[in-house]
Regions:
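Helix-turn-helix
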Residues: 1-18, 22
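Hydrophobic alpha-helical connector segments
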Residues: 22, 26, 36-62, 87-90
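Residue-level detector of well-ordered alpha-helical segments, enriched
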Residues: 23, 48-52, 66, 108-112, ...
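Amphipathic alpha-helical packing segments from all-alpha helical-bundle domains
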Residues: 32, 72, 77-124, 136-143, ...
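Amphipathic C-terminal alpha-helical segment
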Residues: 59-62, 112-136, 147-162, 173-174
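Short, structured loop/turn "capping" segments at alpha-beta junctions
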Residues: 63-68, 95
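Short, hydrophobic secondary-structure boundary micro-motifs
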Residues: 67-72, 159-162
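Eukaryote-specific, intrinsically disordered low-complexity regulatory segments in nuclear proteins
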Residues: 165-167
Length: 175
């Protein structure tokens, strides 16, 4: 129970599909904005990709419920959610573009996005926040996944990557 009457909910949303679409878009919109901002900052592609993976994993680990699981529901494949699919494709493409700057044309450029999304499988869905958002630190899981994303590309880990990434995330948030 969320404390909202059905009539009130349908006053704002014409259908269950619209409610779900709004929820889906709310999970990908902040990440898409952050990814776009990080991709344009003045930093090496290795640092930008590392920061993007860490930032996205950080977001996936910062909610009470595992909203990333919504992406896996069969209904999401429906054409009714085309707007969401476009946003998610843009996010995926940003990961791929930065990885391509590091590796060139190589199928491994698809992997950093999927490594990041593994945070969904690595966290509980029991109403607890695994890693509250912090401007001072990144969750250990986010660091591990970001390291893995660069390792799979055969890229060097940037020096002082955690502090530099926190600064990049802060810069992106301020834009």
């Amino acid at each position: 129970a969320v404390g909202i009457r059905q009539a009130s909910l349908y006053y704002h949303f014409p259908s269950k599909t619209e409610i779900f679409l709004t929820l889906l878009k709310s999970t990908v919109a902040p990440s898409t904005v952050l990814a776009g901002d990080l991709s344009t900052l003045d930093a090496s592609p290795e640092l930008r990709l590392w920061a993007l993976v860490a930032a996205e994993a950080r977001l996936l680990l910062s909610t009470k419920w595992n909203v990333g699981r919504l992406y896996q529901l069969p209904i999401v494949a429906s054409d009714e959610f085309e707007e969401y699919h476009g946003q998610r494709a843009a996010l995926t493409n940003t990961f791929r573009e930065i990885a391509t700057e590091i590796l060139g044309a190589d199928p491994r450029t698809e992997l950093p996005f999927h490594i990041t999304m593994s945070a969904i499988e690595m966290r509980p869905n029991d109403g607890t926040v695994p890693s509250p958002l912090s401007d001072e630190s990144l969750p250990d899981t986010a660091i591990m996944l970001a390291d893995a994303a660069l390792a799979v590309l055969g890229a060097e880990l940037p020096a002082d990557r955690v502090n530099q990434s926190l600064q990049l995330i802060k810069q992106a948030d301020e834009r």
